[in-house]
Every structure is written in structure tokens, then in C-alpha cells.
From Swiss-Prot:
Organism, scientific name: Neisseria meningitidis serogroup B (strain ATCC BAA-335 / MC58)
Free-text function comment from the UniProt entry: Part of the outer membrane protein assembly complex, which is involved in assembly and insertion of beta-barrel proteins into the outer membrane.
Record's GO cellular component terms: cell outer membrane
Protein name according to UniProt: Outer membrane protein assembly factor BamA
Keyword annotations: Cell outer membrane, Membrane, Repeat, Signal, Transmembrane, Transmembrane beta strand
Family the entry assigns: Belongs to the BamA family.
Further details from the record: Present in outer membrane vesicle formulations which are used as vaccines in human.
Pfam families linked to this entry: Omp85, POTRA
GO BP term (any one): Gram-negative-bacterium-type cell outer membrane assembly
């Protein structure tokens, strides 16, 4: 006797299959399969050959196979110890095409459809398509496309396949024509609208599209308005209602926002209650920056709560909770707060699992971690670990995820996921530097050699004025304590006569080798040492300024009108640096500072020294804008038998990295040579300061590659000497001084000071950093060489 169970009818009517006598399954057959393998079906079945079949298995089989999404219909039949499954497969998707989308990109729409299981080669389900189209329509409606029309078309193909074509007619966006506030007495509508990103129509809205309604932006705007009030003392401000009206053809919208301002409150007493365990309550109370009598600010409370949670987290209480109890006093217009702290369990890190480091060895990452295994969970150490791994430069993304350990409520595993970036390069590139022209370079480098963290580089470059070659190797962990050791071999030929710069009438040839060491002294500080042996050749030419000629005559030799210097220099370097920025790429907070000194040691043919100190500070003004303040000072001189700094080791100013708007290397003392050509030969002292407002390019898809800035620069290069047309040490009275006949000029900080202002663009291109700036000199003198537009393309070595 045979019993047929028709799945869809029974399940829709709520009828259970008829009771059968139990039997042992001897065979299972599947009919109706076209693409699905029988083995796949067997894997999903709740029974197998040899099992005892009873009257509950029919429904279970049907549910299991329907749940796969592979079938439109499933029937189960039994006869003589056999199971016969008859199925109707759903068609598979041959192609999925989208046309007409403008606001949303096709790739983004397809990715969204994939989340519903709608993709090429997947099984097609009409209900799923309807659900996905409805969700896509909601997305458009939320972006102000009220006339959106989405038409899906399903075309049946041979071999049980379908093509899906989705046609989108976005229609015109609804424009916001009016934004009105009701209930506001303290601040005007205009003032409140300035807090919002959505606007009424204006001159620039055709470009910014800020008058196109967007649900997400509107919700953010309401939060901004609330923040504005509550950060100015209005503790009990709230938005009562928002009313959005649309005209009949769905092209215009008006927004009415009803608010309750309430009274303006000042800070009262803020106290901490609860068990803070080993974290002293007095220590947490020091984090309470609110001052009684000052206007209440919600952002201040948010910052304080974050600091308290970080402090609790650094003691191992990763899941501490803080409940805030406000106690407003309507009579005194003050508000007290009680912060109830529930520390929860102290959490320990069981294991740290690292994934994504396909090339980089585990030890290279682990030696940067400050959060240890089997140690208390510490939020500050975890954040520092993330920063240190990011500063390696080997990874584009670093993320930590704490996963509770099953059965152990006080332990977590840390999953560290990394996204590796390319650290090796074979470069053949060309660039353009404004003052020296075409720069061609070739090099091979690897910053993460064989995944060990060591780096090696072989580089060469050629420009109109310079020929460079170098070979370097660095082991950042020469010792387990993080002492780095590096070696360098290099050669350089420099002839500025071939460039447009005013540093002319001499050339240098250098070859040397050195060893360097960097020692970490704290988490953020390093001390650097180095020794270099260098052979230097300097040649001056006929009619060179007397300053050059006198130096070569004193320390080198002359041949007619030309002169040359040859000799070995043994240089020692020492420096200290501190890096407390939050990013190696685009810092937004923190600072960099350093002191560096170089001395040509006794035994060198020339004996001189130089020292510099620099500082750069970053201050976040908002999520978008960062203020950068920087400065540098330097001094150089001779000692022993060398009474002055060699002219070819002078400081120079002007151009990118100094005072923009003035030609590179032209600031400081100047003289004429005997050809009557103006020469800049620099000074032994320098000072530069800069203020720069940094922000990403509006509308850029990747804010991490392009950055704009507005800047102001000031700087000076001087030597303290007095020059005139008869007795200048630089001209020897042979030609007229550039400052005018009979005039004298003392090279002081004030006299040589120049400043400028302008804008700049920095692009981290595949060829290297590209910099463009336009500056307007704010202090000009007749002898200055102005260059408002300056740029540097490609990389130089």
C-alpha cells in the first residue's frame, strides 16, 4: 500500500500526515533534481538509510528541504521500505542587471541584493526579490527620492534559469523649501539651522544637495540641535515633534520642528557612588572636570564618563557600567549628578589570536603588543597596542575584538584582525621638482623583509643638480628590548649651478658609510646615535663670492681662479625624539618633538657642529578640521681649527618645508658674484614657525589620500654679520652690494624674517607624496625672489 504526502497542502491546512506503521528505511530516492546533487539533498535530510521511519519524519523532511531555499515544492512518498522524494527545483539566477541608478552605485545595490541571496548562480525566490526591492525603495525614500520607481523583470531561460533586470527611475528629488522651528525663544531659526547639515534651497545647494531630504541626516541634525542647546546649559531641552509635509507631486518638502527649550542650568555637585574596587575613588573624582557655577555642558559629561570608563578598563573592569542620575533644582537652576559605578567582574585576557598576517610573522606583531596574555584586560594598553601595530606601516587596518570565554565569565580571548598592505616595491618613476626640474629614480625596497620586520633598500635618483645612490639595512629589533641597528652606504654629487636656485658657484661630491642605533627609553621616546665616515670634495669656480674662495683657500687649495677641498670627515650624530601622535598617516592629535645634533669629530679635516630642535603639535578642532602648529630652530658653527661653519653646510630657507612663497633656498644673507649674479649662501642660524588648518578634500571618496590646508609661515636664516658695498666679507668689495650703494645691512633674525600665507594640497599618490602650494608673501624686500606657486611631484631620495 502506498501513501502520498503532499507537503504544501498539508502544511497550509494544518493537517498532520496520517499515522503509519514504523518501518526501517531501506532506500531513499530523489526525483526532479536538475542542478542539485543527490548527495546535497541527503546531507540535509533528518533521516538516512537504516533509520526507523515514523509518522513525524514526513513533516521534518519537508521542512528541512524547504529551509535550504533550493526548492519550490517537496513531496514525500513511502512504499515497501523506500522513501521517494519528488522535488521541483527553484530556477537559478543567470544574470542580475541594474539600470537607471544614479544616487546609489550599481555595485552597492548588488552587494545589498547579495545579502538577500540574490546573485548570479544563486537560487531564485520571487518572495525574496519582492522583499529586496521593497528594502531598496525604502532606502531611496529615506534619501528624498519620493518619486522612486523600481521595476523588476524576471525572464525565464532554458535549463531552469532566469535573468533578473531591475530598472530604476529615481525621479526628481524632493527639495526642502522651508525649515521652521516652533517653541524656540532663546535662539533664532537661523541660528538653529546653522547646526544642521540639511538646508533650505540656496545658491550652492545645486552642488551640495543639502536641500535634499535624507532620513539619516535629519536624525543626525536633530541630535546636533539637541547637543547645541544642552552644551549651552539647557539641560532639559528636548524636541517635542517633527512634522514633514510633502506637496502633491512629491517635489517639495517643508519641515516643522517643535522644541521645548526649558531653563538654563549651571553645574551643581557631581559625585561618584558605588564600589570602584581597587581603583581609588579619589582618583576617579580627579577626572570630574565640572566646575560648580559654570553652565552645564552635555559634551563635558560625555567626556568625563569616557575617561572614567577608560580608567576602570585599564584596571581590568572591561564591562563596567555607569548610570547617571541627574538631580535638577528648578529654583536654583542648578543640576547635581550622581554617577553610580558598577564595575562588574575583573576581566583577564586568556589568549590573543592574530589573523590576517599572511606574510608578517606573529612575533613581529606580538612584540608591539602592550596587552599581554593571562594579564588583566587593560583598555589603555589595548589602545597603545593598536597604535604601535599601526605605526609599523605593514597594515591598512588593525582591529581588536574581545570574545567571552565559554564557561569562564571573567576571561576573554582577544581576536586581532589585520589587513596587510604591500611593503615591498620595485620603483621606476619620474617626478618634477620645481627648482631642480625632472627627477628620475629607481629603487627596490622591502620594509618587512621576509616578514621579519627588517627593512632593506637600494635606491638611485638623478636630477639636473643631483646624482644619488644609497644602500641601507635596518633591524628594528636588534635586541629584544627594541634597540634598532642600521647600516648605510651612500654617494652623492651635487652641482646647483645647473638649477634655477640661487645657491651656485660650487659643487660637492660625497661618498660615505655609516652605522646608526636607536634606543627606546620610554614608550614614546627614543634616543638615536650614529657614526659616519665620509669623503668630501668641494670645488668652487671662477668669480665665486669671496666668502667661498677665502674658505677654500684657507682649508683647501686653489688652482688659478678655481679652488677645491678634499678630505675625510668623521661625523657623530645624537638625537632624541618623541612621538605622541595618533596616526602615522594623518595625525589629528598629539605632538612630535625632537632634538638632533651632528658634529664633525676631531680628526676630521674640518671641525664643525650643527644642532636643531623641532616641534609639531596637532589639535582636533572637529571631526573634519585639525590645527597643526610647528616650529624649528637651528644653530651651526665651527670649532678647533675650523673657525666657522663651512659655507656648504649653511642653513637655507624658503620654499616647501620652510617659508612658502619664496624661492627655495633664497632666504638669508645674499651677495653678488663677480658676474653680477645674486647668490644666496645661507646662514648659521635658522628659525621657522608654521600654523596650518588641515582638512580632507570635500567630496573625496578616500579622505586618507588627499588633504587640503590653509597656512601661515614665518622664518628667518641669519648669521649676525654686517655687509656693505666696500667691506663685505662675502664680496670683498669687488662688486656693489645688493642692498644699495653706500648702505649696510646687518643679517639679524628680524632683518631676515619673512612670512607668507596661502593654501596647499597634499596627495599620497601611488608614485609618492605630491605637494602643491600657493602662497602670498606678506613681507617682501627688493632682493627677495618670489615664487607663489610651488609644487613637488613624485619622490626623491
Amino acid at each position: 500500500m502506498k501513501l502520498k504526502q503532499i507537503a504544501s497542502a498539508l502544511m497550509m491546512l494544518g493537517i498532520s500526515p496520517l499515522a503509519l506503521a514504523d518501518f526501517t528505511i531501506q532506500d531513499i530516492r530523489v526525483e526532479g533534481l536538475q542542478r542539485t546533487e543527490p548527495s546535497t539533498v541527503f546531507n540535509y535530510l533528518p533521516v538516512k538509510v537504516g533509520d526507523t521511519y515514523n509518522d513525524t519524519h514526513g513533516s521534518a523532511i519537508i521542512k528541512s528541504l524547504y529551509a535550504t531555499g533550493f526548492f519550490d515544492d517537496v513531496r514525500v512518498e513511502t512504499a515497501d521500505g523506500q522513501l521517494l522524494l519528488t522535488v521541483i527545483e527553484r530556477p537559478t539566477i543567470g544574470s542580475l542587471n541594474i539600470t537607471g541608478a544614479k544616487m546609489l552605485q550599481n555595485d552597492a545595490i548588488k552587494k545589498n541584493l547579495e545579502s538577500f541571496g540574490l546573485a548570479q548562480s544563486q537560487y531564485f525566490n520571487q518572495a525574496t526579490l519582492n522583499q529586496a526591492v521593497a528594502g531598496l525603495k525604502e532606502e531611496y525614500l529615506g534619501r528624498g527620492k519620493l518619486n522612486i520607481q523600481i521595476t523588476p523583470k524576471v525572464t525565464k531561460l532554458a535549463r531552469n534559469r532566469v535573468d533578473i533586470d531591475i530598472t530604476i527611475d529615481e525621479g526628481k528629488s524632493a527639495k526642502i523649501t522651508d525649515i521652521e522651528f516652533e517653541g524656540n525663544q532663546v535662539y533664532s531659526d537661523r541660528k538653529l539651522m546653522r547646526q544642521m547639515s540639511l538646508t533650505e534651497g540656496g545658491i550652492w545647494t545645486w552642488l551640495t544637495r543639502s536641500n535634499q531630504f535624507n532620513e539619516q541626516k535629519f536624525a543626525q541634525d536633530m541630535e546636533k540641535v539637541t547637543d547645541f542647546y544642552q552644551n549651552n546649559g539647557y539641560f532639559d531641552f528636548r524636541i517635542l515633534d517633527t512634522d514633514i509635509q510633502t506637496n502633491e507631486d512629491k517635489t517639495k518638502q517643508t519641515i516643522k520642528i517643535t522644541v521645548h527649550e526649558g531653563g538654563r542650568f549651571r553645574w551643581g555637585k557631581v559625585s561618584i557612588e558605588g564600589d570602584t574596587n581597587e581603583v581609588p575613588k579619589a582618583e576617579l573624582e580627579k577626572l570630574l572636570t565640572m566646575k560648580p557655577g559654570k553652565w552645564y555642558e552635555r559634551q563635558q559629561m560625555t567626556a568625563v564618563l569616557g575617561e572614567i570608563q577608560n580608567r576602570m578598563g585599564s584596571a581590568g573592569y572591561a564591562y563596567s557600567e555607569i548610570s547617571v542620575q541627574p538631580l535638577p533644582n528648578a529654583e536654583t537652576k542648578t543640576v547635581d549628578f550622581v554617577l553610580h559605578i558598577e564595575p562588574g567582574r575583573k576581566i583577564y585576557v586568556n589568549e590573543i589570536h592574530i589573523t590576517g598576517n599572511n606574510k608578517t610573522r606573529d612575533e613581529v606583531v606580538r612584540r608591539e603588543l602592550r596587552q599581554m596574555e593571562s594579564a588583566p584586560y587593560d583598555t589603555s594598553k589595548l589602545q597603545r597596542s593598536k597604535e604601535r601595530v599601526e605605526l609599523l606601516g605593514y597594515f591598512d587596518n588593525v582591529q581588536f575584538d574581545a570574545v567571552p570565554l565559554a564557561g569562564t565569565p571573567d576571561k576573554v580571548d582577544l581576536n586581532m584582525s589585520l589587513t596587510e598592505r604591500s611593503t615591498g616595491s620595485l620603483d621606476l618613476s619620474a617626478g618634477w621638482v620645481q627648482d631642480t626640474g625632472l627627477v628620475m629614480s629607481a629603487g627596490v625596497s622591502q620594509d618587512n623583509l621576509f616578514g621579519t620586520g627588517k627593512s632593506a633598500a637600494l635606491r638611485a635618483s638623478r636630477s639636473k643638480t643631483t646624482l644619488n645612490g644609497s644602500l641601507s639595512f635596518t633591524d628594528p629589533y636588534f635586541t629584544a628590548d627594541g634597540v634598532s641597528l642600521g647600516y648605510d652606504v651612500y654617494g652623492k654629487a651635487f652641482d646647483p649651478r645647473k638649477a634655477s636656485t640661487s645657491i651656485k658657484q660650487y659643487k660637492t661630491t660625497t661618498a660615505g658609510a655609516g652605522i646608526r642605533m636607536s634606543v627606546p627609553v620610554t614608550e614614546y621616546d627614543r634616543v638615536n646615535f650614529g657614526l659616519v665616515a665620509e669623503h668630501l670634495t668641494v670645488n668652487t669656480y671662477n668669480k665665486a663670492p669671496k666668502h667661498y674662495a677665502d674658505f677654500i683657500k684657507k682649508y683647501g687649495k686653489t688652482d688659478g681662479t678655481d679652488g677645491s677641498f678634499k678630505g675625510w670627515l668623521y661625523k657623530g650624530t645624537v638625537g632624541w625624539g618623541r612621538n605622541k601622535t595618533d596616526s602615522a598617516l594623518w595625525p589629528t592629535r598629539g605632538y612630535l618633538t625632537g632634538v638632533n645634533a651632528e658634529i664633525a669629530l676631531p680628526g676630521s679635516k674640518l671641525q664643525y657642529y650643527s644642532a636643531t630642535h623641532n616641534q609639531t603639535w596637532f589639535f582636533p578642532l572637529s571631526k573634519t578640521f585639525t590645527l597643526m602648529l610647528g616650529g624649528e630652530v637651528g644653530i651651526a658653527g665651527g670649532y678647533g681649527r675650523t673657525k666657522e661653519i663651512p659655507f656648504f653646510e649653511n642653513f637655507y630657507g624658503g620654499g616647501l618645508g620652510s617659508v612658502r612663497g619664496y624661492e627655495s633656498g633664497t632666504l638669508g644673507p645674499k651677495v653678488y658674484d663677480e658676474y653680477g649674479e645674486k647668490i644666496s649662501y645661507g646662514g648659521n642660524k635658522k628659525a621657522n614657525v608654521s600654523a596650518e588648518l588641515l582638512f580632507p578634500m570635500p567630496g573625496a571618496k578616500d579622505a586618507r589620500t588627499v588633504r587640503l590646508s590653509l597656512f601661515a609661515d614665518a622664518g628667518s636664516v641669519w648669521d649676525g654679520k654686517t655687509y656693505d658695498d666696500n667691506s663685505s666679507s662675502a664680496t670683498g668689495g669687488r662688486v656693489q652690494n645688493i642692498y644699495g650703494a653706500g648702505n649696510t645691512h646687518k643679517s639679524t633674525f628680524t632683518n631676515e624674517l619673512r612670512y607668507s600665507a596661502g593654501g596647499a594640497v597634499t596627495w599620497l599618490s601611488p608614485l609618492g607624496p605630491m605637494k602643491f602650494s600657493y602662497a602670498y608673501p606678506l613681507k617682501k624686500k627688493p632682493e627677495d625672489e618670489i615664487q607663489r606657486f610651488q609644487f613637488q611631484l613624485g619622490t626623491t631620495f
